[in-house]
Amino acid sequence: MLTTNTLAVLLLLFLSLCSGQSPPAPEPIAADGPSSPVNCLVSMLNVSDCFSYVQVGSNEIKPEAACCPELAGMVQSSPECVCNLYGGGASPRFGVKLDKQRAEQLSTICGVKAPSPSLCSVLGFPTISPAGSEDSSSGSEGSDKDKKNGAMTTKYCGVALNSLALLLLFTFLSLS
């Protein structure tokens, strides 16, 4: 039987293999990741004080005072929803177009340790591209092909991670 330490090492090894892939970010739409944006609706509502800071065109120098405690609560209760925030999950539901740089810097500004956008991508959650970047793309066939290949890599890493997580769960349950 595998020990807990062996399983942890295998998980870390697998994560490092998948994180070596660098797929381009998907379009800034609310695509479903492993956890549907509907599951994060309450968490998104709870960080609504952050929206005025992270929206495209915001002139605010810092987030509202209530934003940082709300973000810390989201990270503690449902960190996958932070990935949803990076992925634009707030955009269609609340009419907020997110500025990628501001969304990614929010945890640093608030002093909250949150999942990084690159980790969210590895785990299969969409992340948004920089504001306006889709308008400035050349639209060449080569770049479209690269985007599709990157999306496939992320998809398969996400599926493999989910399978590995289930394997770990069953192993831990059988050890009990």
Swiss-Prot record:
Pfam families the record matches: LTP_2 (PF14368)
Topological category with respect to the lipid bilayer: Lipid-anchor; GPI-anchor
Signal sequence region: 1-20
Keywords: Cell membrane, Disulfide bond, Glycoprotein, GPI-anchor, Lipoprotein, Membrane, Signal
Subcellular location: Cell membrane
Expression tissues: Preferentially expressed in the endodermis of hypocotyls and roots of seedlings, and in petals and anthers of inflorescences. May also be expressed in siliques, carpels and pedicels.
Glycosylation sites: N46
Listed CDD domains: AAI_LTSS (cd00010)
Main localization category: membrane
Propeptide: 150-176
A cellular component annotation (GO) from this entry: plasma membrane
Disulfide bonds: C40-C83, C50-C67, C68-C110, C81-C120
Lipid attachment locations (GPI-anchor amidated asparagine): N149
Function statement: Probable lipid transfer protein.
Family: Belongs to the plant LTP family.
UniProt-recorded name of the protein: Non-specific lipid transfer protein GPI-anchored 12
Record organism: Arabidopsis thaliana
